[in-house]
């Protein structure tokens, strides 16, 4: 089998895995939304949505473009058999984007009252605080996904997305139902419970991706002793030049 045919088969196989994962996630998301709205009511769901509006902005700043940039850089380094380079790309990206994600999480957590006030929904502040750790978790998750995709391995990304959706469904709905229907808490507390399910889902997906990364490291070729990877500064510059245009258009 020629190398071109192998690449083509890998591409279409990866695309099929991603497509299947997206379909499963969409089905789970549809099942999730209907009972969530019923449990939270219009007021609680408004708090839930307000928290996600801020979350999505910070998520765009901290993660948009990372998987694509990482995938391209890892793929190019791997094609040239620069295995030290692939490891360094991963380490530099995880450190930098992880730090950016943690910063954005802190902004969301400590700025929750400010953001909620701007949106005229002060009750949403609690939801924002519960959701804040997810920004950092998704930043790390994006780096792991980009690394796997750089090796044309789409399975971990698809599995992690399904894990996210399932944990969000099970943990989120359970906590929202328990707080409102069993404990009789206000709607915004139920919304915070549902959002806790999101944070747990991101943590579960990140743990899976970290496990998959460690598992696959045992099968990666040993780098050549003479190989000299690029400097961290150059790697970061290249990654940002690839990621920033995607972030701007996201």
Language model region names:
Residues 155, 166-212:
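Membrane-interface helix-loop junctions in multi-pass transport and translocation proteins
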């Amino acid at each position: 089998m020629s190398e071109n045919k192998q690449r083509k088969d890998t591409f279409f196989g990866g695309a099929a895995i991603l497509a299947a994962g997206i379909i499963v996630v969409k089905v789970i998301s549809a099942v999730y939304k209907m009972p969530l709205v019923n449990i939270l009511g219009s007021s609680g769901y408004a708090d839930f949505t307000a928290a996600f509006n801020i979350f999505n902005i910070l998520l765009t700043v901290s993660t948009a473009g990372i998987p694509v940039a990482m995938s391209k850089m890892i793929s190019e380094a791997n094609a040239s058999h620069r295995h030290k380079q692939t490891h360094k790309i991963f380490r530099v990206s995880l450190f930098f984007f992880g730090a950016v994600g943690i910063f954005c999480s802190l902004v969301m957590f400590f700025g929750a009252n400010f953001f909620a006030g701007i949106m005229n929904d002060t009750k949403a502040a609690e939801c924002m605080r519960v959701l804040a750790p997810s920004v950092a978790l998704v930043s790390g998750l994006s780096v792991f996904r980009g690394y796997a995709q750089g090796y044309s391995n789409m399975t971990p990304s698809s599995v992690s997305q399904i894990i996210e959706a399932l944990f969000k469904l099970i943990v989120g709905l359970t906590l929202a139902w328990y707080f409102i229907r069993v404990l009789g808490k206000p709607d915004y507390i139920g919304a915070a419970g549902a959002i806790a399910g999101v944070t747990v889902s991101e943590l579960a997906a990140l743990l899976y991706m970290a496990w998959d990364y460690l598992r696959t490291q045992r099968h990666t070729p040993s780098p050549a002793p003479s190989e000299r990877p690029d400097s961290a500064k150059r790697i970061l510059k290249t990654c940002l030049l690839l990621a920033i245009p995607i972030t701007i258009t996201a």
